[in-house]
Amino acid sequence: MEVNKLYNGDILDMFSKTPDNFIDLIVTSPPYNVGINYSDWDDTMSYDGFFQWVETWLKECYRTLKPDGRIAINIPYETNFQERGGRVFFTADFYAVMKKVGFNFFGMVDLNEPASNRSKSTAWGSWMSASGPHVCNVKECVLLGYKESHIKLNKGESQWEYEEKEVDGKSKKIYSQEDKDEFYELVFAEWKYFNDSRPLTTATFSEDIPSKAIKIFTYKDDVVLDCFMGSGTTALSAKKLGRNYIGFEISEEYHKISEKRIEDYDRLVRIEKKSKEFFDY
């Protein structure tokens, strides 16, 4: 398995080629099984069947993560499954499977999308009446887990730069206020994000989500995997932040989109580098 490469194929086939203890961070947003019309995936499995499938790939996530590896999974708090009588606490059931395969709980991030971007439909319940309203939490979260050690065993280069200054006769690391504010947001587990106004796939991953997870949970040059890569947002975020990336995607169409995004970014970097060299000359 090579790093900085995007693989087109079934998730379990791709995991079978991935070594044990190889990945530093898995950050992904899997199908929610809510009937989305994906090009190469049936998003209408039975509830129990869905979580049996989840268990198979979570076992592979656990196997391929390093002992101090982390996992960050973007899912909804609740979903609607008529076979279970309506709303179900999806996050709780998902975490139960994570725990079953061996993951330790590392926290849960509340994703804060501007209210103006949320659906205001009430077709799922009564309107202006106590008859049968459905109290519906449309927000999503990021479930966090770690494999064996919650502390990184091998230190690396941090995301945030600092100046070394002497304060009261002692050397102290001084960070910018902007970086400190960002760190506070990440550790207090309420991440602001904006969905792409021009989605490239059926369910495009907001770049805000993987970039925040990568910043807070990895060092530079760490290996980041997205096993449901979609349009390549996690890989692109990792590349921009100086990490190595791996992506799995079953859809040939989405795989091509993700490769083009990486190629376009590389082209832009080369152009900017040449422009800088020209003006510095």
Pin down the residues of each PLM region.
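Short, flexible loop/turn segments with low-complexity composition
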Residues: 155-161, 269-279
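Short, conserved SAM-binding/catalytic segment
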Residues: 1, 259-272
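Conserved SAM/SAH-binding loop
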Residues: 8-13, 275-281
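Core catalytic lobe of class I
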Residues: 1-257
